[in-house]
Amino acid sequence: MAKTDDFKAKTDDQLAEQLGELKREAFNLRFQAATGQLEKASRVKEVRRSIARIKTVQTERARSAAK
């Protein structure tokens, strides 16, 4: 699981790319959970929180750019 500082060090393009990857992974994990094939249930929580961290960094940057 990545820390917020790791996300802050990345560019906007890198964050957008990683956000897309995490969203795809979250979809796949939800699908696995629905079909009973999920091996690590904790990964769902990690991915969800990483998505939230990326969105938080993006919002912070958007607000600081608007000032």
Swiss-Prot record:
The keyword Oxidoreductase does not apply. InterPro entries: Ribosomal_protein_uL29, Ribosomal_uL29, Ribosomal_uL29_sf. Pfam families: Ribosomal_L29. One of its GO terms (cellular component) is cytosolic large ribosomal subunit. Keywords: Ribonucleoprotein, Ribosomal protein. The keyword Transcription regulation does not apply. Signal peptide: none annotated. One of its GO terms (molecular function) is structural constituent of ribosome. GO terms for biological process: translation. Belongs to the universal ribosomal protein uL29 family. HAMAP family: Ribosomal_uL29. This is Large ribosomal subunit protein uL29. The lineage of its organism: Bacteria, Pseudomonadati, Pseudomonadota, Alphaproteobacteria, Sphingomonadales.
